[in-house]
Amino acid sequence: MTDEAIRTRINHLSQEEEALYREAAAGQLAPAELERLTVIKLELDQAWDLLHQREALRNAGMDPDTARPRPIDMVEGYQQ
């Protein structure tokens, strides 16, 4: 996955997250949508991690295409 594809995914997920937050603020969030919001947050963490891996590999003179998404349970515990 290219940097551009990852950024596109991040943007898409962020837009979906914002829409769900607007619904939540209006008191219109169904339980399934609340669950989706949780999944989006985890997927965003994973996508940002992959983008950071690619940048680190590139900066080290290595092939960024060797970066792979890490398991969600690994990236969700990272400190911001």
PLM ranges: what are they?
Residues M1-Q80:
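Extended, charge-rich alpha-helical interface modules
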